[in-house]
Amino acid sequence: MTLEEVRKQIDVVDKQIKSLFKERMILADQVARVKAESEDAIYKPDREEAIITKLTGDVDDSIKKEYTALIKRIMEVSRKYQYGRTLELRNCLNVSFVTEEPKVKKLAMLKHELYICQGYSRDLVNTVSDYEQVMELIRKDEVDAGMGIFEDISYGVSDSLHEALAMNDLYIYRCDEVLDEGHRKKVVTFGKQLVVLPEHNRLKIVFVCKNKSGSLASVLSMISDYGVNLTEIHSVPFRGGEWNYRFYIELNGNLLQKEIQALVFQLINETETFKILGSYYCEQ
């Protein structure tokens, strides 16, 4: 058999796969409708593992890993579709935000970062020694917002500010870039409410993956499936019973977009912990 003949047979098989895939997605839509009504969970890892074990039981070892990967991928695509349909059928995204940027009269920031304060009178800025004190002033309503250097583009991110935002109910709503002695730095403003404006093009999130093989790859593949670009990613180890990592990701998108809402909905349901750290506009 020639290569051309083999390719023709592959084309026939691909058309059959396409037809079966379309049929399967019709069924996935029916599943989404039922689960939206019953509020049943879309992702059931134990059930998926049982199905994979059953389907791969009679598959030759030489192609078992490849078939397993295919089945997992089909399940991932089906779940993605179901999350989007569920939001269309039932408004169940539990994320509260406002659509107007708050007015800021008083700020809190680190004393050694006071030089990056722009647009505010310095006599209205409360300077402290660490970010926990900044967070405390905001919580007590003694200031309207906090400000800090989020990232030195030449060197890296501020782990302390990332961690402070991750551990508190505070959100970035503005990001400005300043030039300091030849170094470009991202300076963020953050407050009590998640603010989402139409012009925002960045969404900052933090999550912890489920502690199993391939979990991070699955999340990154999920984000890619929504056609969303990552503009920054880094991890920070922490001890929560056993060692794990918090992953901080900046997405190119806006929470007002349906696709981004579906992605967030899926991440909430398929990661160990998840939090939005902010929504803002960024030129870079």
Label every model-predicted segment.
Residues 1-284:
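Domain-level signature for soluble enzymes in the chorismate/prephenate branch of the shikimate pathway
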